[in-house]
Every structure is written in structure tokens, then in C-alpha cells.
Amino acid sequence: MQDNSSHSRESASAGDDPLGIDKLTVDYDYLLYKIRDYVQSIQLDTTELCKKQNEVMVNGIIENTIDKNIAKFKELLEKCDTLENHYEMLNQLAIITDTFKERIAEAVNNYNXLKKGASKSK
């Protein structure tokens, strides 16, 4: 009997693993390592992708907001230009009415002068 127990000790110390449990343990540990490494790789890729997507969204939102603001400012500038044109028209009307008053007064004076001249001729 002692021969059997000493034989099993010698087999174990020699690395003889008839069921392959040691190899299975190493393979299992290696598989866990690969899975963990793969998950970390996916995590890093996902994190990087999410950061890039966030930047795109933030920049896109900012760009859209800026574009909308620029469009609104252009509309305001167009309205200001239109308003300025209306004021120019008012100024032109003021000039026309001022000169119109002068021309009417001159026409009335000329008419009166012609009327006086016609009265003297009779």
C-alpha cells in the first residue's frame, strides 16, 4: 500500500495530470484573462466613441445655435436696413415738401404778378 501512495506522490510531483485539471485551470484562467481584456477593450472603445459622439452633439448643437443666431441677426439687419430706407424716404418727402412749399409760394407770387400785370394792361 505504501507503494501506491508513494507512486501517486511521485506522479503528482512529476506533473503527471491524467485528468488535465492543471491544463484546464490554466486554460480557464487564460480564457478569463482574454475575456477581461476584450471587455476592457470594448469599454475603452465605447467610452471613446461616446466622448466623440458627445463632442459632435455639443458642437452640433452649438453650431446649430450659432447658425440660428446668425440667421436671426441677418433678419434683424435686413429689418434695420428696411427701417433705414423708410427713414430715408421720410427725409426725401420732407425735402420735397419743403421745396414744394417754396415752389407753391413762388408760383403764387408769379400768378399774383401776372394778375397785377394783366389788370394794369386793361
Swiss-Prot record:
Signal peptide: none annotated. Keywords: Coiled coil, Cytoplasm, Transport. GO terms for cellular component: BLOC-1 complex; cytoplasm. GO terms for biological process: endosome organization. Residues 63-95 form a coiled coil. Disulfide bonds: none annotated. Residues 1-10 have a biased composition (Basic and acidic residues). Its main location: cytoplasm. The keyword Cytoplasm applies. Belongs to the BLOC1S4 family. Component of the biogenesis of lysosome-related organelles complex-1 (BLOC-1) composed of at least BLI1, BLS1, CNL1, KXD1, SNN1 and VAB2. This is Biogenesis of lysosome-related organelles complex 1 subunit CNL1. It comes from Saccharomyces cerevisiae (strain Lalvin QA23). The gene is CLN1.
